[in-house]
Regions:
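Short alpha-helical elements
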Residues: 2-139
């Protein structure tokens, strides 16, 4: 009994400085963004061109429309309502997302790509609800 207490005391004094799994937590905004970007690329299909943008005239942006949609979905998934908080958190990921756009550009492009975002969401729901099921689902 005394030996167990001594071992527990030793373990209680140990301090974890860095978790090994810290990089892969689901509140990691970049991890969620990367997963949603891959899903959006698979689902978008013919809605976007090879660079991930809706076909339109003008300069091709470095931060694609699919990346804007994925960033929007990631911020909603994490529960970030404020754009200032979103861009404050994104400063931690400047290395991972080098072509990040400004808040003003994000707002403008998010409004432009809102229909694309809705279509991708509808296709996601269709994939989840109907395509992977063999029997009808009761709602």
């Amino acid at each position: 009994m005394f030996k167990k207490l001594c071992i527990l005391l030793i373990f209680s004094k140990l301090k974890v400085t860095k978790l090994l799994i810290d990089k892969y937590r689901m509140h990691n905004l970049y991890a969620i963004f990367a997963k949603l970007l891959n899903i959006c690329k698979q689902i978008a299909g013919n809605l976007v061109n090879e660079s991930g943008n809706v076909p339109r005239r003008g300069v091709v942006p470095k931060f694609s429309d699919l990346e804007v949609v994925a960033l929007n979905m990631a911020s909603e998934a994490v529960g970030i309502d404020s754009e200032s908080l979103l861009f404050a958190k994104l400063q931690d990921y400047r290395v991972e997302i080098p072509n990040l756009i400004s808040r003003r550009q994000y707002n403008d492009r998010r409004k432009i790509t809102s229909s694309l975002c809705n279509v991708i969401r509808e296709r996601m729901v269709f994939e989840i609800m109907y395509k992977n099921r063999t029997e009808p689902m009761l709602i």
